[in-house]
Amino acid sequence: MSKRLRSSDVCADCNGPDPSWASVNRGTFICDECCSVHRSLGRHISQVRHLKHTAWPPTLLQMVETLYNNGANSIWEHSLLDPASIMSGRRKANPQDKVHPNKAEFIRAKYQMLAFVHRLPCREDDSVTAKDLSKQLHSSVRTGNLETCLRLLSLGAQANFFHPEKGSTPLHVASKAGQILQAELLAVYGADPGTQDSSGKTPVDYARQGGHHELAERLIEIQYELTDRLAFYLCGRKPDHKSGQHFLIPQRADSLDLSELAKAAKKKLQSLSNHLFEELAMDVYDEVDRRETDAVWLATQNHSTLVTETTVVPFLPVNPEYSSTRNQGRQKLARFNAHEFATLVIDILSDAKRRQQGSPLSRSKDNVELILRTVSTQHSTESQDNDQPDYDSVASDEDTDVETRASKANRQKLQTLQSENSSLRRQATASACQVQTGSDHKDTASHSSLKRRPSARGSRPMSMYETGSGQKPYLPMGEASHPEESRTRLQPFPTHIGRSALVTSSSSLPSFPSTLSWSRDESARRASRLEKQNSTPESDYDNTACDPEPDDTGSTRKGRQRSMLWQGDGLLPDTAEPHSVPSPTLPSTEDVIRKTEQITKNIQELLRAAQENKHDSYIPCSERIHVAVTEMAALFPKKPKSDTVRTSLRLLTSSAYRLQSECRKALPGDSSLPTDVQLVTQQVIQCAYDIAKAAKQLVTITTKENSS
C-alpha cells in the first residue's frame, strides 16, 4: 500500500491536497468538493464532520485519524488497487475532475454502491459467513488493530453480535480490554453501550471495573448522544453526566402562553407511541445535523470558486430504507423557521426526559411549546390531495441538480429492489430445498434467542448515520425479530450491485438512554409486543389506532431501533381484533413458494419497464402483481394467529393496492397539472419493494413454522 493512500494530507476520494472534512463511518478525510457529494448522499451513507469547525469528542477524532493513517481507504477502493483495474478502464477521481459528473459518480460508486470493496465468495448460507465474521470481530476488538475491525464490519460483521458461547458483545470485550478507539468504532456501527451480557453487566460496568474511567464516561455520553446534541444545538451546552445530570432542557426566551393550536400539537406529540416518538426524535436529530453542517459549510467555502458546482442540500436526502411517507415528513422539517424548530426540539427534549423517568403527563402550565403552524398549514392545503406523494419543493435555485439527484436515486432504488427480488428468488429456492431435505434448525434458533436475552437497547435506530444492518443484533437466517427487520441482510448479493444493504451500515448512532428502570420480565414482555408497535402509522408521525401499513424501513430501527424501553410501554394496546379467534393454520411452504415465484416474476417485468421508461406498461404489470398477491394472501387464514403473519399480509396487500394507484398516475391524464413521472416511478419502485419484502417475510415464516 502506498504512503500516498495512508497520508491524511490528501483527500481519500480524489487525492486533492489538505482535506478539511472527515467521513466518520468510512474512516477517511475528504476535500470540500468531495464533501459536497457526501452530503448529498445523506448521513445513512456518509457522516461528515469538519475537522476544525465542528466539536469533536477527542477519542472519536483520534479513531478516524488512526483509521485513515493506517489505510482504511483501501477497504473502499480494494479493487482499484489491483493493477488489472487499470486495464478495465476503472480509475479514481482526480483533483482536476469536475464535481459533476466525474467526482460525484465515483463517490456514489465507492460508498453507495460499494463497487470497489472486496467481496467474499457467495455461499449457500451467507448467515454462516456473517456469524463467522462477527465472531472474528468479537475476538479482534480486544486488540488495537482498528483497520482489521473496520474491514470485518465492511464485510458484514455485526457490531451488536451476541456471542452464543461467550455470552457477550464485541463492545463488552473492547470495554473490558480498555480499547477506547475500538469502542468508538463499534459505536459508529451501532454497538449499544446499554446491552447486558449473560451476567447482566453492560460495557460501562466492565470499563469501570477495569479502571478505564475515560472509556466508561465516553460510553455514557454515547448513550445520551441524541438528547445531548439537541440541547447543544439550542444553547451550546451539554448536561454534566459525571454529576448525574443526563438532560438539559433550555428555557424559552419569551413568556407567551401556548395557543390552543400549540397545546393541541404538544398533546399530540406526547400521545405518540414510543416507537413513533423515537423516529421523530431521530429525524429531528438528522435535521439538526443538516442545519449545523450547512452553517459550517457556508462559513468555510470560497464561494467564488465553488458556487457553480457545490451540491445544495436544501432538505434531508431520501433514505431508501425509509418509507416514502417518512421521507416526506423528514423533508418537511426544513420548512420550520428557527423559532418553530427550536420549540420542537425543546418539546422533544422535555418529553424524552418524561418518558425515560416514567413521569405522568403534567397538567400544569409548561414552559415550552410546540409550534407546528407550518405543518398545520400544509395539512389544510394538502388535505385535498393526500394521496399524492409529496416530496416538498423546498426552495432551491438548482432545480436541474435536484432532478439529477432524484433520477439517480430512482436508479439506486431500482438496483436495490432488483437485489431484493433476486434475494427473494434465492430464498424461495433455498426454502424449497429445505422442505425437501427436512432440515431443522429449531434447536439452534431457540438456543440463540435464549442467549440473546432482551436488553434495554437491543438494537440501534438506523436513522441518523446508518443504512441498515450494523445497528441490529445478529439474527440467524430465518429468525425475524421484527416484521420491518425481516428483510434479511445476510444473504448473498448479485454481482451487479454493491453489498450496500449489508455493509453500509454506519451507525454512530445518537441514541436515547438505555439505563431505564425496566425489569427483565417487562423487557421480555415488551419484546413480544414489538411487532405490534411496528404496525403503527407514521404519516406525519400520527398515532391513530387504525390498521396501518408497517414502516418499510427494513432495519431496526432501523425493530430496527435501539429500543428505548420507556416507562409505561406495557400499556400499548394490541392492534388485533379483540373478539376474533385466530387460526393457527398456515399454508404449505410449497404453495407459498409457488405464489412467491409468480410475484417475483411479475415484479421483474415491472422493473424492466421502469428501467426502459415504458410507463404505459406500469398498469398491466401492476394488475398482474395484484392478482398474484391476492392469490398468495388467499392461502393464509383470514385471522392468523401470528402477529408477524398479520403484519406481513397487511403490508403485502396494501402495497399491491398502492402500486396500482401509483401506476395509474404514470399515464397522462386530463388534468392541466403535469405528471411528475420521475416521482411516480420512485413510488412505484417503493411499492414493489414493499411487496417483495412482505413476500420474503411470509416465505421465512412458513418455512420456519412448517419445518418445526
Curated annotation (Swiss-Prot):
Role, per record: GTPase-activating protein for ADP ribosylation factor family members, including ARF1.
Entry's Gene Ontology molecular function annotations: GTPase activator activity; protein-containing complex binding; zinc ion binding
One Pfam match: GIT1_C
Protein name, entry field: ARF GTPase-activating protein GIT2
InterPro entries: Ankyrin_rpt (IPR002110), Ankyrin_rpt-contain_sf (IPR036770), ARFGAP/RecO (IPR037278), ArfGAP_dom (IPR001164), ArfGAP_dom_sf (IPR038508), GIT-like (IPR047161), GIT1_C (IPR022018), GIT_SHD (IPR013724)
Post-translational modification: Tyrosine phosphorylated when coexpressed in cells with PTK2/FAK1 and SRC.
A cellular component term, taken from the record's GO annotations: calyx of Held
Bias-annotated ranges (Basic and acidic residues): 519-532
Biased composition (Acidic residues): 384-401
PROSITE patterns documented for this protein: ANK_REP_REGION, ANK_REPEAT, ARFGAP
Lineage summary: Eukaryota, Metazoa, Chordata, Craniata, Vertebrata
